[in-house]
Amino acid sequence: MPHYLSPAELERTAPAETGSFRSPVPTQIVSNGEFNPLPQTREQQRVEARIKEMADQLGPRHGVSRRGFLASAAGMAAAFLAMNEVYGPLFEVTAAEAQQPGAAAARASGLAGQFIFDVQTHFVRDDFKQDGLLGLAQYAKQHWNPAITRENDLYRFKFENYVKEVFVDSDTKVALLSGAPFDDPTWDLLSNDQIAAARVAINRISGSRRLLAHSVFTPKKAGWMEEVDRCIATVKPDSWKGYTIGDPLFPSKNGTFWRLDDEKLVYPFYEKAVKAGITTICIHKGLLPADYEKSWPGVWEYATVSDLGKAAKDWPKLNFVIYHGALRPFQESPDGVLAEFNKTGRIQWATDLAEIPAKFGVKNVYGEIGTAFATCAVTNPRFAAAFMGTLVRGLGTDRVLWGSDSVWYGSPQWQIEAMRRLEIPDEMRKKHKFAALGSADGRVKTAIFGGNAARLYNVQVKAALGAITNDKIAAIRSEYVAAGGERSNARYGYVARHTA
């Protein structure tokens, strides 16, 4: 996994798969490398301690070990009970789910058929050999965990583990595979051809349309428009992925940052996209390091949405999907960020995104929640509620999309469960005129989880579910569960080494 973090910042982190408790829900922020992970807060310490306590108490009642309990539906319920005890009743969960054998499993079984379309997933190519990535495990062996073996093994980020974590260990039905551009091509996770090849492989194996594909477009890079033409002709992506900030690792020395509303540079690409009928443009926004104003001078502005309104208005036939909800990762305490929201009603850059439809009179702007929701859910679920409320209020229920940024965070099932159970508190809804998120399979969450993406990608949900329910991956998952297979609860990013 590529990362923004400097050597000094890496010294303050540990690999999530070895440095954090394998809770059903992460008990501290896991960074995907695009931002600095906050130290574990006192509240998160309390949540972790309570989860461990319940696992020790309730595991024997279920006839399983602590590890077995934590990997079960009952363990997942226990994690949300613990979070409610610490943060207040933000998650819909009952004590019976954790305490009574079979109760949580029955609920999980009832929701297992839900249509979930994850529009942000990743893995790396088999021949990925960037020393900066392989060196993370070597560094971990030297500094964090001498017991690590096979430190040069990137299996956890590769194809087979991706299939297991996303399609077998979670309720995800359809996923969109993405990529990212870099000034140094040796950092490329997957080429456009490799993304398309993965789409062919998974759909051929499964016998259904399980995987969709991005093609990454890179304005200002040599030959970028020729690559667009080639992708339209031969790769035939389901949508496009762009990074207005250019290289997401470091401020581009090649000046590859750009604006969505650059009429001379980017509008000719939009013309080609409309003509080809590939009209969904996914854009990475937000998620900068803590010191972005100093470390990305003259570049960080390209991660904001200041360029979105005009482009969306000028190109009504295109759909602009802004990843991570444009949220800027906040390195101040969660309490301070929430206090600022309570005072002003605004969330930096995310509120700007949510206001664009009203300000510009457009209906073609969408927000994907990705890493933004994942980090909010584990550090301060009340803020997660504010974030979701802000996007739904401004963009509309039908323009917020589900994405997990997996496989960096392991199986996305914990994120799915967090969204299924999250509700915006009554007083927050009244003060900010937010709509309720509703039940796990209610109108709002059904739209977010899959209905909205299905509409963008021309997926007929009933037909898709019919095919998916009977495909090869569904059979593999059934056999896996019957044989006692369970989630690893592993995450693959970074966590802070110290507590707050």
Regions found by a protein language model. Give the residues of each.
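N-terminal secretory signal peptides
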Residues: 1-64, 91-92
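Mid-to-C-terminal alpha-helical segments outside catalytic/metal-binding sites
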Residues: 64-84, 104-106, 115, 131, ...
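Acidic (Asp/Glu)-rich catalytic clusters
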Residues: 164-171, 192-208, 228-236, 272-275, ...
